[in-house]
Amino acid sequence: MSKETDRIFAQPLAQVPDFAFNEDVVRVFPDMIKRSVPGYPTIVENLGVLAAQFAQPDTVLYDLGSSLGAVTQALRRHVRSEGCEVIAIDNSSAMVERCREYLNAQNSMFQELLPVQVIEGDILALEFKPASVVALNFTLQFIAPEQRLILLGRIRDALVPGGALILSEKLRFDDEQEHALLTDLHIAFKRANGYSDLEIAQKRSAIENVMKPDSLEEHRQRLLAAGFSKVVPWFQCLNFTSLIALP
């Protein structure tokens, strides 16, 4: 399937709308996220590797906020535990439609993949089945802050012994100098990937009202409050991190 170049914010906009995962974003999403999130391909592929270590037979592997299904595809490539299935859920109809197309293409290229359900829905309303792996890959930051602990508690309750939550997020930093440095370095990363200053500024204006990052310590304390016993950072590149949370 062809992948288009992200030019959504390339022209000056009189009024920058709030960012939304609509058809325009879906069309360029693979290019957008690769050029915007340092280490994204590494996180996604290794999410599958990590999941294979925690997957338990006859359980569900959840991809919450699955977008185009990159994590779901990685889970299916790496996990071989008997009786497992992947459930991918996203609230964007455009994302869900395209995700199903990508997964159908994956089915045609590989054999013996885990079965998968792709659901259009709200992860806050999801009735969890017993799960051994839950992936929240740059999803929690788009959920209302007051709902985050509730969701994590429900995930913790659904996890079976030996399972894990894998949480990837953009970080903010309480230290002003550290925050400014890593923000500037992230801007440099995006410039190096071909984004103009106009694109960077307009994307920031679009997303600042819908994405609310937390600090690493806020994530750690919230996960512990939700009932997780251990929080282990396994990846960080600039102001992006991924954590393993054990029940």
UniProtKB/Swiss-Prot annotation:
Q: Which UniProt keywords apply?
A: S-adenosyl-L-methionine, Transferase
Give a yes or no for keyword Kinase in this entry.
Answer: no
Which GO BP terms, alphabetically? tRNA wobble uridine modification
Positions that bind S-adenosyl-L-methionine: Y40, G65, S66, S67, D90, N91, D122, I123, N137, R204
Q: Which GO terms describe its molecular function?
A: carboxyl- or carbamoyltransferase activity; S-adenosyl-L-methionine binding
EC number(s) for this protein?
A: 2.1.3.-
Annotated membrane-spanning segments are none
Kindly state which reaction or reactions the protein catalyses. Answer: prephenate + S-adenosyl-L-methionine = carboxy-S-adenosyl-L-methionine + 3-phenylpyruvate + H2O
Q: Mind telling me which InterPro entries this protein's record contains?
A: CmoA, Methyltransf_25, SAM-dependent_MTases_sf
Which CDD domains does the protein's record reference? AdoMet_MTases
User: Which HAMAP family does the annotation name?
Assistant: Cx_SAM_synthase (MF_01589)
Describe the protein's quaternary organization and the partners it interacts with. Homodimer.
Function according to Swiss-Prot or TrEMBL = Catalyzes the conversion of S-adenosyl-L-methionine (SAM) to carboxy-S-adenosyl-L-methionine (Cx-SAM).
What family classification does the UniProt entry report for this protein?
Belongs to the class I-like SAM-binding methyltransferase superfamily. Cx-SAM synthase family.
In its UniProt entry, what is this protein called? Carboxy-S-adenosyl-L-methionine synthase
